[in-house]
Amino acid sequence: MELKDILAISGQPGLYRFIAQSRNGFIVESLLDGKRMNASASSRISTLTEISMFTEGEDIPLAEVFTKMYAYTEGKQGPSTKEGNARLKEFFGVVIPDYDRERVHDSDIKKAVSWFNLLVGAGMTKFEIPEE
């Protein structure tokens, strides 16, 4: 499983693995429960390689954020998203100290940590963006 095959679908919880293309969109499999569904072509779908986080300098790809989280947690999951915004911001501030505190909202941090935990729970250990 590579990061380029992992999708975030607007309005749907969790992350999805790309399975195949269908007439009306994509067939995807949930990383949460393993169920397959059809994601219509009109849905807002993003691969995780297309997403980046705001920092004080250059924006950094989500893959780099996940790599830093993985190194910091030593291969374990990060804090639970139920621990509250203060704990998640503290964790994120240690992992990405120069993130833009004005443009990165609490919900963005919560989603990034949630996705990281989901990927680690699914056995993903390398968060690299493949060369084109």
Where are the model-predicted features located?
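Conserved phosphate/pyrophosphate-binding and hydrolysis machinery centered on Walker-type P-loop NTPases
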Residues: 56-59, 78-85, 102-109
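C-terminal charged interaction modules
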Residues: 87-132
